Amino acid sequence: MEYITMQEAWDQIEAIPGYARKKSSLLKVREFLGLLGEPNREFQVIHVAGTNGKGSVCAFLTSMIREAKIPCGTFVSPHLVDIRERFLINGEIVPEPEFIRAFLEVQHACEIWERRGEPHPTYFEFLFYMGLCIFRNAGVRVLVLETGMGGTYDVTNVVENPLVSVITSISIDHTAFLGSTIPEIAAHKAGIIKSRRPVVYDDSSSEAAAVIFAKAKEMKSEGFPVTPDEVRRGIRPCLVKSPDPVDPGVAGHQEMSFSYRGEEILFEIPFAAPYQLMNAALAVRALEVSGLPVAPEQAAEGVKKAKWPARMEEISTGVYLDGAHNADGIRAFLDAACRLKELRKPDHVRILFAVSADKDHQRMLREIAERLKPDLWILSKMESHRTLSVEDLEAAAEKLRAKYGEETEYRVSRDVKHAVKELLGLH
């Protein structure tokens, strides 16, 4: 058998182009999966699409299913540190030997594929194929599957009979691929709805909900909207104490009463961000609709134990990490951050900000400055070819300084690792 190290496999994957001149059709995707023995037919699937909240919904679902001891695989993106984070088996990162085994399986299929004159799969396609092999090899029964981008033409949409489709919050993002309006983007997301298969969706946006409702009707699928009012009615006033003995008064958790299998269940949400209430509600409703044998107490315990890094994650006392990447994500981050600022009343608010060049960074910076009012900004490059340049970061710092005054300090860093050390050194 061929031998390859984890690092060698990872390096080869990272060398795969992220986009192809021509996107693989789902027909071609199914043809490629045939070379792998059609692993896509091995699981019961919960398919999750949306702009924001997909990963959190997947995390809640995974934790609840795991609590019921149902063998569960989870495919999510992107990874933060280790590429294996994209593939979870019963909530745990796939072991290196299983990662390498799947890599070699897909690599072998690619060699056959290219000999036929077909183009090599894109980065995301390759990882999706790997995920299906990983989960098949692990004997997974239920797959929680997050889309990459959009829905209709996403490689994950080869799923034919999901237990339930879930569509989270929809906002403006990836406009070059999905369109520039909410209805256009919602139409792409709604593409995961399958004939006569139920769909659970966030009803916060009337524009998006109308598109999803129409698509569900077209597909003869039953729709299960979760409304903001339904979530708000369930919120319970609480100040759940943090496990941190030095600062025990932090509202690190939230409580929400929500219907599950005909019972009103009190769910403890282990995240400070208000938007996680809707994400938890979507996951609970989707689990109920899926018909999976998860008891109410298992669902409640699963939500309580859910983990999802970089979503207002407190990595050290008073230090939060958040992966907001678009306008709605920034607003959700600010809702949570301002809430915590009000509760904790810190002496200083310092922020490290890094962003991709294709994002509306000026708008993001303006909203953060006006609402959170940081004392110190560190604007940094990321370790990515998509990062905003140092020159653009410096220009952004100058604009902030001109508008919000000299009393706020601005720094620009060429190295995000150095920037993190600098920030933590001040804490």
Predicted regions and their residues:
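Short functional linear segments
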Residues: 1-50, 56-68, 75, 111-118
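Hydrophobic alpha-helical packing residues
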Residues: 61-69, 135, 397-400
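Nucleotide phosphate-binding/pyrophosphate-handling subdomain across enzymes
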Residues: 142-145, 153-166, 170-171, 261-376
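Short, surface-exposed connector motifs at secondary-structure boundaries
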Residues: 191-199, 340-349, 373-376, 403-406, ...
